[in-house]
Amino acid sequence: METGLRTGELIGLTWDSVNFEKRTITINKTLEYRHKQGCWRAGPPKTPSSYRTIPLTNRAYEILQSVYATKDTRKQSPALNQVLEFMDRRTGEKSSLIMKDLVFINWRTGEPAKNSSYDTHLYKLCDEATIKRFCMHALRHTYATRAIEKGMQPKVLQKLLGHNSLQTTMDRYVHVTDDSLRKGVQQFERNNQDQNGVKLVSGQ
């Protein structure tokens, strides 16, 4: 909700990609757990446009500072001893992900939280709140929709989400909510009241 990251981008975030001074994070790799193979797989972001640097909100900055302050006391499993190689999508050169440098791990197991674990936790929260279940990717859609509702420029949102095209951002990720419909009508009504009369507009 604070960054609009894809789940794999969040899981694969490492400390060398966090700049506390500039208050940014850089997205240049992903990480996912392959259940059939029983192993972790590092990879590049989805497209060349997915390589990006994102300014942090105050809330995101505070969370990262809190995690960083306790990173040396967290449990570490043997899985964190791995260094995973992958191909950089932009250069075609080999790159690597050092597992022990991951920002987010499971404090109980000392391993990176699997993709499915995030969804499972969300499902539990939804059940407790007695609302319809949704997955992690739905939060990315929510981020996009709320950003536009709060006045963010579409091209800026496209850059933050790492999309190739603005059409993808606006048609697939930004949704018209009941609240935005209501506000749109209220804005129309206010603007209409500011006018002395109504000028008819034909289709000619």
Report each predicted region and the residues it spans.
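Short, charged phosphate-coordinating catalytic segments
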Residues: 1-31, 155
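C-terminal secondary-structure termini that scaffold catalytic or DNA-interacting sites
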Residues: 22, 35, 39-51, 58-60, ...
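Residue-level detector of conserved, well-ordered beta-strand and adjacent loop positions
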Residues: 28, 57, 105-107, 174
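Short, basic (Lys/Arg/His-rich) helix/loop patches that form interaction surfaces
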Residues: 3, 54, 71-93, 99-159, ...
